[in-house]
Amino acid sequence: MARRDPEAESKDLNWKEFEAFVESAFLSFGYKTERNARLRKPRAEIDLIATKTGLAFAVDCKHWKRTIGYSGMLAISNRQMVRASRLVGERSMRVIPLVVTLHDESLRILENGVPIVPIHKISDFILNWENSSDDISVLSPQVME
């Protein structure tokens, strides 16, 4: 049986279908999901929230045709960190900010603790993120107070 190539499959998807593709990966591992979650005051949106056992991934899905480099990705991840922090406050649960990209940005975990995961590695990340948990930002209600 041939292995599926998530990157090749994702290239022809539009951004909305890409979000659904990322969501399907989390669903396949038993996560409950919510797409396009809106935050208020100030208004913001999280592409995907994937929740399991008191932990949520706040996922920003980036279906860009090219890579953007370190400084661009750091700016994007910082904004996702802010949205994830707000989610902690609204839902009182631990939250991991995450950026999923179409292409491999050759970055793993940025200095702010936000993982950058190319779509072809999303399943492996979901299964094994705890192996890198010392480097990953896990925002919790106790820390946010």
Model-assigned labels for residue ranges:
Residues 1-46, 50-145:
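Intrinsically disordered, low-complexity Ser/Thr/Pro/Gly-rich regulatory segments
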